[in-house]
């Protein structure tokens, strides 16, 4: 009770604790507080209970639970970061096929292959690298990247070992030699292509699922994709300067293809075995993405139409409950159930829950695959990707012979030639594509508008998100289309007469192709993850990534036909082609192909803007 103004408040008897000891003048404040804590009644929940020796069990349990939760969170973070690091290392090795131009010309001169046969080898690798991508993505989404990584390591080891022995055996019988048949080399590169696809997708999917919902998803995906492009650079340098054929003066000549193939076989087998244990998807993140997607489908009303799912509210109301008969006899049953029966019941419920979660995941991923395939914008995006990657892949695979056509003499390529070494061009395209991938990934994160999922009942009439208008932003298509223009500029320069008169310009052509091609390969999977989500990313990206197989095969055949036709009409008898006619018309066709791809992407972009889909 309070007294009058200016007076100290009066103490009522109800404010006084009868259990409190009276303090003596010699008692310290700490001792007085301790006495106060022990003077509280035991029957009340008070702070004193926490300090008593008999009642600290609850506090200890809470502390242990917090420590264990923090330990699990730290363990998950270590797994997430470790998987990302090994995913980047995996991609640094998986892109070995990008160094094909390093040894492609030697297949012409050492094994007496025709240009068409060399392209058949590269096309076999390209088709086998792209066609199984959807299957590999499906396996990553439904199961785990680990088995796929082990399979990739074994396939790499077998493929490169087989290719090494085919090369060492010499020209095949139908080319005037006693070596292994040509089809064995094709089989070897089919295995290499499948392994490339599996290892690359396992690494990228792991990174996408572990970091796919963060604000830095662009750079997280760009780093392993850039590492994939860098693999051709460092591997070609190792082959050129360490695994080379020694000349009489102890200098390096051409790459020793036999040793180079064996080196790749051992390296990639090791990466695959380690990746079996290192590439892991954090379960909590994947379950969170699945649950969020299911909840969004429920809100949109689409999930209620499914024969598989009931509304979540009904499931929660029925989950863990029993019928009225069980409730009436609950007390009797509780007394009769033994501990072992309770454990069996708990295990059964846990198994049922896991089965339900697995069925939910499979249903959702299948449903999202159907949505993805039914979306016409996906086909416009894939068409543009087909028209762009075909010329890009053909340029990468035939870079070695393109460089040779610009050297008008028939001697071996040396540093003094203005067109440069094939390994130099492989390095240029690897560096420029890596820089482009990292820049576009980081810049798209910085300037792209905030993405949102677009599971709506009427996607075509859905308005734009008002939140995205609050700040200036650049769509990822604003980066994709200029990248395609850079790629077309590279082919346009190659189609002009300038490179034949100034072979040093071939370095600029390679740089432009690397910048454009690298940016496109970085942005397209990022766009897929933004528009259609990361829950089914492996399958969705795998479907789109199949299209370059047809494009690479088509433009590779066109190039080899033009090259061989020009070589047959050449006055020299070295079986090689020199001059503009070897690649000129092919380059013009590649330029127009990229321009048509830009139109296809503009159509997709227009549709996304009309829907309100933020890209």
Curated annotation (Swiss-Prot):
Subcellular compartments: Vacuole membrane
Basic and acidic residues bias: start-end ranges: 11-20
Glycan-carrying positions: 112, 329
GO cellular component: fungal-type vacuole membrane
Molecular function as annotated in GO: transmembrane transporter activity
Entry keyword set: Glycoprotein, Membrane, Transmembrane, Transmembrane helix, Transport, Vacuole
Segments for region (Disordered): 1-35
InterPro entries registered for this protein in UniProt: MFS, MFS_trans_sf
Keyword Ligase: no
Tagged with keyword Membrane: yes
Membrane-topology annotation of the record: Multi-pass membrane protein
A Pfam cross-reference name: MFS_1
Regions that span the bilayer: 84-104, 120-140, 147-167, 182-202, 218-238, 261-281, 371-391, 428-448, 477-497, 512-532, 538-558, 583-603
Location (main, coarse): membrane
Known role: Probable transporter.
Family under the similarity heading: Belongs to the major facilitator superfamily.
Protein name per Swiss-Prot or TrEMBL: Probable transporter mch1
